[in-house]
Design a protein with these regions (language model features):
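N-terminal hydrophobic or amphipathic helices and topogenic motifs
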Residues: 1-77, 107
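Bilobed "Venus flytrap"/periplasmic-binding protein-like clamshell domains
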Residues: 4-24, 84-126
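Polyanion/phosphate-binding surface patch
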Residues: 76-77, 81-85
Length: 126
């Protein structure tokens, strides 16, 4: 009998690196079939909150809203000099950006409201 395990990950290079060997049958997993669910991180966050996957990538921000998931000892993708990064056109400091946001004259693109990038942005702008 084959045990099926759904594994959610993004198409990003760091996730692809972690799952390459399994996805390309470079590793034998006797009795286990991995169902790869490849989605953007915001969709994976929502799937985790709804308990739709056995194993998944999830933002630190979204993790607090999940049930029945444990953080694994490996697989994290977070560190110094590695996103999120805020860039702007022109010479703007954080106070300028905050004022423009409050006035509705500024837009900041984020990968999702449950992402760690969004949480860090909100903390940085306070």
């Amino acid at each position: 009998m084959v045990r099926r395990i759904s594994v959610g990950h993004t198409p990003d290079a760091d996730d692809a690196f972690m799952f390459y060997a399994i996805a390309n049958n470079k590793v034998t997993l006797d009795g286990v079939h991995i169902e790869h669910v490849v989605e953007d991180i915001e969709r994976l966050n929502r799937m985790a909150i709804n308990g739709e996957l056995d194993v998944t990538a999830v933002s630190a921000h979204a993790y607090v809203y999940t049930k029945d998931y444990l953080i694994l000892k490996s697989g994290a993708s977070f560190g110094l000099s590695y996103g999120p990064i805020l860039v702007s056109r022109g010479d703007n400091n954080h106070k300028d950006i905050l004022a423009r946001l409050e006035e509705g004259r500024c837009t900041i693109a984020v990968p999702g409201r449950l992402t760690t990038a969004y949480l860090l942005l909100m903390l940085a702008l306070k």
